[in-house]
Structures are given as C-alpha cells and as structure tokens.
Regions:
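A solvent-exposed, acidic/Ser-Thr-rich amphipathic alpha-helical stretch
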Residues: 32-37, 50-108, 117, 123-124
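Bacterial N-terminal signal peptides
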Residues: 6-16
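Positively charged n-region of N-terminal signal peptides that target proteins for export
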Residues: 1-4
C-alpha cells in the first residue's frame, strides 16, 4: 500500500513539474530578453567589440549558415569577424537590426527572423537573419544563425 501511494505521489510530481515550468513561461518577458540580446550585440559591434558581439552566440558550438556554407564554432566566427571587418569604424561599419519577429517553439527555443543593415563606405550590406535561439542556463543565446546577404545598390544606401 505504501509503495502504491509513493508511486502515485511520484507520478503526480513528475506530471506537475513540467506544467509548473510551462505556467511560469512569460512570452512577453522572454521576447524582451531575446530582443535585449540582439540589442546588446548591435551595440557591441558598433563600438568595435567583436567579442562582446559574439556573447549573443552559443559558445563553443554555434552553427553559422551563410554564402552557401555551413560553419561550426564560436572561435572561428570571432576570428572571421576580426579578419574580415577589421579594427576601424570605416571597415566595420554601423550595424542595425530591424523588423524582427520572434516565434516561440518551446519555453527554451525561439526563432527570430529579421533584417539587418551594415552601413560602411565600401560594400554596404543588407540582408535577412534567421536565428534559432536556445535558453541555456537561464540565458538566451543563438544556436543557429542563417544569413542571406546582398550588397546594397548605391541608390538604396540612403535610408
């Protein structure tokens, strides 16, 4: 009899725990947290802090998809940003993320789709990001980042 009661209590706790966790999920708060990550990344990029920019990505095993290639790894991405965008504001440009939407796939997973613009004297860029965010240890990070980029035509640069 005691075993039956203990088994029933264990079953109730097992069922109730996920329900309690889901009830605590506040979509508005979590969406704001994700937008906060992106805002922090934008600010870090614009002050030349590539390492700060990379804090928005899962370390070490983030996946990047861009230019028809799949690249794995946080450190490699950081090295690419430093090499490809350089140390000066002119080479780095000014980054702006905009028109972003977030869809929650689970309490610990969300998809963000948005646009970005990189204003710089040579080769200004614009594109679309599709990002899979995961909540790990209470913090939202990008686990998968897909970019479709294109150079901005000279007539489109003035926004």
């Amino acid at each position: 009899m005691i075993r039956t009661v203990l088994a029933a209590m264990a079953l109730c706790l097992a069922v109730a725990s996920p329900l309690r966790a889901q009830a605590a999920f506040d979509e508005t708060t979590e969406r704001a947290a994700i937008f906060g990550v992106v805002s922090d990344m934008q600010a870090a990029w614009n002050r030349g802090d590539y390492r700060g920019y990379m804090q928005g990505f899962k370390n070490p095993d983030v996946v990047f998809v861009s230019g028809g290639k799949i690249k794995n790894g946080w450190q490699g991405a950081l090295d690419d940003y430093i090499r490809n965008y350089g140390p000066t504001p002119e080479s780095r440009g000014t980054l702006t993320f905009y028109d972003m939407t977030v869809e929650f796939l689970a309490p610990d997973a969300a998809q963000l789709i948005g646009h970005y613009r990189l204003d710089r004297p040579e080769r200004p860029m614009e594109g679309i990001n599709t990002r899979l965010f995961r909540k790990i240890d209470g913090r939202w990070v990008i686990a998968l980042n897909h970019v479709s980029a294109y150079e901005v035509a000279p007539t489109q640069q003035a926004r």
